[in-house]
């Protein structure tokens, strides 16, 4: 009984240390790493519309990436910014 108890305590103590050590050694990536944001090149003056901005970003060939298309969002300065995969 005593050996089983000490073995269990040892396992419960060693496994979390191993897992923590393995997790620390893995490279951590920032969630937005590899994504770029550029202004829409041919934006007309006037207020920015999110739906139109997103549609125009998806139409731009320069913002296409493998497996998807760009997303557009209006900035606080009424500029359309296209977010796309740049790596």
UniProtKB/Swiss-Prot annotation:
Q: How is this protein annotated for GO cellular component?
A: extracellular region
Q: Does the keyword Cytoplasm apply?
A: no
According to the record, the signal peptide region is 1-21
The entry's keywords: Antimicrobial, Disulfide bond, Fungicide, Plant defense, Secreted, Signal
Q: Does the keyword Metal-binding apply?
A: no
Name the record gives this protein = Putative defensin-like protein 169
Superkingdom of the source species = Eukaryota
Entry similarity comment? Belongs to the DEFL family.
Listed under GO biological process in this entry are: defense response to fungus; killing of cells of another organism
